[in-house]
Amino acid sequence: MKNVTDNLVINNDDLNIKSMKDLKNPVSYGKDTSADFKVQSPGNFKYENSKYEIKSDIIGDHFKSNMLGAVILALLNGIEIKDSLNAIESFAGVKRRIELIGISKGVLIYDDYGHHPTEMEATITALKQQTESKLYVVFQPHRYTRTMEYFSSFKDSLKLADFAIVTDIYPAGESPIPGISSKNFEEESIKYLKSIRYVPEYLSKKVQNGDIVLTLGAGDITLLGPKILKYLNEY
């Protein structure tokens, strides 16, 4: 792919990026007053004394931050801000990124590919902001090695939900590691269920009108959302 710009677009609010030295021609955005594109609130930014708003039905402040980065990159390559904003407004999103699977009895079912603590936290936080009711998260850890490395961070992310269910680890070709098990997540607000097939019936006894259910993971948990929806419709 041919490079048409020599600039580097950076999120000035990211401490990891700010700690990097010798960045070539950085163009920055963020809440920091030194940013080239100043973010006033999620989706609202100022550039060269003009104010702009990112309008999108896609849920999550982190997505709006990514969208702004794309707007800036497009501008550097000759595409006007207003044209990029119009394109974003008509963008319906992608599968498995806070994807609405359906609604049954007032319960909204979402699915997301998130399987790293940082993206899980962003997704859970985004959905928590959408409801005053309860958020139930069903998480299928992906790989034994990843579960071992990020166990504490996974648990912290899950605690952001009102209640979480963790199923057995999806191995993705890995062999089990002694002592690494989804059972280790279990506590008052986190329930361990061995298989995703037990989840629909279990959740049906807990969820109420207005609640949100989020399935999270990179394994076959993506098949669970429609099954939860079907179970709620039938029982």
Task: Please describe what each predicted stretch is.
Residues 94, 118, 124-189:
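Active-site beta-alpha connecting loops in nucleotide-dependent enzymes
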Residues 191-199:
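Short acidic-hydrophobic, aromatic-tinged amphipathic segments that line or gate anion-handling sites
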Residues 2, 158-159, 207:
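A short, aliphatic-rich alpha-helical micro-motif
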Residues 1-109, 132, 183-188:
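Acidic, Mg2+-coordinating active-site environments of NTP-dependent enzymes
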Residues 10, 28, 137-139, 166, ...:
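Structural beta-sheet core signal
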Residues 198-231:
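A glycine-rich beta-strand to alpha-helix segment
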Residues 109-115:
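Switch II (G3) loop of P-loop NTPases
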Residues 18-21, 38, 147-148, 175-176, ...:
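Short glycine-/acidic-enriched loop or helix-start segments at secondary-structure transitions
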